[in-house]
């Protein structure tokens, strides 16, 4: 079907991180923002390694966004890091359309439960066709902030789904 996604950034969870969806989003004028998790095999491992090396070498220090979180009985913050998609192995760049011009995104959440004081750390990774740089130069801070907002928006939808499943057993419904 036809959708006008011109300029939109479309997010999907790891289950839907498939080339066919990325192609369909791009065909309709949008950009994909797709979760990369362990169920996607080596893509996840390779992205994780790229960020690990870049952070260790302080290559992405200036390409970071940090946001405070306060609510739902938790306090903490998110850090979002962005690397150019072209850093991925060519086997992925041949497979994923527009990723060579796009971004790799890492988000780290540090959350502390206010009642218990227990702190958790979660890491999430994404691939996106959204351009890393408008002119081939360094990334703009506004792009990093936009990627951080995409992560926040993505997890807002994910947490809403979690509540629906918890209360209404939504994942148990079988549609035919």
Model-derived features: positions:
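Short glycine-/acidic-enriched loop or helix-start segments at secondary-structure transitions
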Residues: 20-22, 44
């Amino acid at each position: 079907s036809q959708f006008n996604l011109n300029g939109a950034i479309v997010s999907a969870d790891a289950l839907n991180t498939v080339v066919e969806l990325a192609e369909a989003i791009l065909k309709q004028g949008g950009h994909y923002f797709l979760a990369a998790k362990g169920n996607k095999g080596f893509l996840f491992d390779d992205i994780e390694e790229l960020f690990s090396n870049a952070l260790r070498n302080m290559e992405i220090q200036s390409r970071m966004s940090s946001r405070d979180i306060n609510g739902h009985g938790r306090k903490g913050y998110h850090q979002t890091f962005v690397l150019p998609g072209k850093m991925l192995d060519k086997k992925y760049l041949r497979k994923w359309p527009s990723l060579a011009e796009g971004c790799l995104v890492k988000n780290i959440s540090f959350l502390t439960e206010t009642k218990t004081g227990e702190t958790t750390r979660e890491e999430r990774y994404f691939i996106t066709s959204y351009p890393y740089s408008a002119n081939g130069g360094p990334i703009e801070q506004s792009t990093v902030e936009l990627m951080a907002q995409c992560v926040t928006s993505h997890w807002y939808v994910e947490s809403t789904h979690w509540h629906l499943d918890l209360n209404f057993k939504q994942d148990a419904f079988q549609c035919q």
